[in-house]
Amino acid sequence: MRTPRETDPGSVTVLHAVQPGDGGVARVVVDLVRAQLAAGLRVAVACPPGTALSTAVRAEGADTHDWRAGRDPGPGLVRETRELGRLIRTIRPSLVHAHSAKAGLCARLAVRGRVPTVYQPHAWSFEAVEGTTAALARRWERFGARWADRVLCVSEAERRTGEAAGIRADWAVVHNGVDIARFASDGPPGGSVPTVVCVGRLCRQKGQDVLLAAWPAVLADVPDARLVLVGDGPDAERLRAAAGPSVRFTGAVDDTVPWYRAADVVVLPSRWEGMALAPLEAMAAGRPVVVSDVDGARESLPPDHRTPCLVPPEDPAALAAALGRLLGRPELRHRLGREAHEHVLSRFDVRRTGAAVADVYRELAGARDAEHREPIAQ
């Protein structure tokens, strides 16, 4: 067991290696970077250029480096790994924090234990695929865990999923957090049209296809209801083709706050999650959320909200019933929204998240002072 040591924050350089450069992962990284800079750490970020993340962390004052990495493994993997290795040799970080599967793959191959490394899956890659591809992903995660000083999970459920897959790691669990003040609202929405909002990447994971399948049954109960899908992604064209006139697509937006505030109910019918930000952001805005009964989403809810707000995954009928019930009962919506806000305030404040991650860093940075590590090969 390594013993934490007091470390001057200004002597610690953290390199965040990140792919993807958008969506919830990017928002988590921006919040961490902001907190770490405020704490006096030196922070560098390697991420794809021209992304929302690259723009945001540069604006925060982080040392930002272009890392031209695609989202999935492919023919460019060797080049991407070598490029990240060159950046690491140039930056000489005290610690590397790799976010999501692709950055976790490249960073661990580049470093191979020679710099303290935190790997944060943000939901396991093997949950997104099936068959041989899933088996290969599990096999890599089992092997690659030896090159992570910590595997940092965003929920206990994510950790359990990793353990069940045979990954033997030095685990840490730190829940995602949100900026409560940014998302807080003055009360229920003032509009007269019942509005359901779904914020998330338009992809199979987030389950917008299930939501569109449920929507006709919602309209049967609440004919004037409107559905807003906030975000963009690979399934956008297919989802638009399946949507009726009561469904609006916003595309990618820079600020989701107005959409949460416009919502009567926020929904995220995911097939799997690590711990999604959208439900936390919605609850911070005082909105009730309906989520799928999957790991990571379930863990975000107040325990007594599970009956009205938790539905089986890929079950349009159950999803429609939950949405219709909340749209038809404003007093229930308002009570759940108030309770949701208090729940997030007490458990998911981003300041709590930043402090917990800093504790992990301090332990690993102190351990690095106590041992010799070989330099990264040229």
Language model features with spans:
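Aromatic "clamp/platform" in nucleotide-sugar-dependent glycosyltransferases that forms part
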Residues: 252, 271
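Acidic anion/phosphate-binding donor-loop and adjacent secondary structure
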Residues: 72-79, 163, 175-193
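Conserved acidic donor-binding segment of nucleotide-sugar-dependent glycosyltransferases
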Residues: 303-317, 325-330
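A short, well-ordered alpha-helix in the C-terminal region of glycosyltransferases
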Residues: 325, 332-347, 353-358
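A conserved mid-protein helix/loop that constitutes part of the nucleotide-sugar donor-binding site
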Residues: 23-34, 106, 194, 198-217, ...
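A short, active-site helix/loop in glycosyltransferases that binds the activated sugar's phosphate group
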Residues: 147-172, 178-182
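Short hydrophobic beta-strand element within catalytic cores of glycosyltransferases
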Residues: 288-292
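N-terminal strand-loop element at the rim of the active site
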Residues: 15-80, 161, 173
